């Protein structure tokens, strides 16, 4: 067992051995307030041996998956209807989430 902290949240991990690989079935999600914060987390993960993926997902150098999710995207999806569809469609073309583009999509 190993205890660690992620973004101020205490976590507990267990080494399951080589039979248990990291996958997208598990990820950490960090909710961000703006583009600066989104960029800071994204660049810290991807810029240190990580890998970009689609729709705000990335993988760190140890193969752990992360979702860097601006709150504006979560709010747009929760709004439902056309606003959610426009935000979803915009997100589908992104790797790192572009906050300004999501805001523009919300407005239509």
What are these regions (language model features)?
Residues 2-53, 59-108:
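Glyoxalase I/VOC metalloenzyme domain signal
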């Amino acid at each position: 067992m190993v205890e660690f902290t992620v973004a101020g949240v205490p976590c507990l991990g267990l080494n399951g051995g080589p039979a248990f690989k990291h996958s997208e079935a598990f990820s950490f999600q960090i909710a961000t307030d703006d583009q600066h914060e989104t960029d800071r987390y994204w660049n810290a993960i991807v810029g240190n041996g990580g890998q970009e993926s689609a729709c705000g997902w990335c993988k760190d150098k140890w193969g752990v998956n992360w979702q860097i999710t601006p709150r504006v995207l979560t709010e747009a999806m929760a709004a439902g209807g056309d606003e959610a569809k426009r935000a979803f469609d915009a997100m589908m073309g992104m790797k790192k989430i572009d906050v300004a583009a999501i805001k523009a999509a919300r407005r239509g």
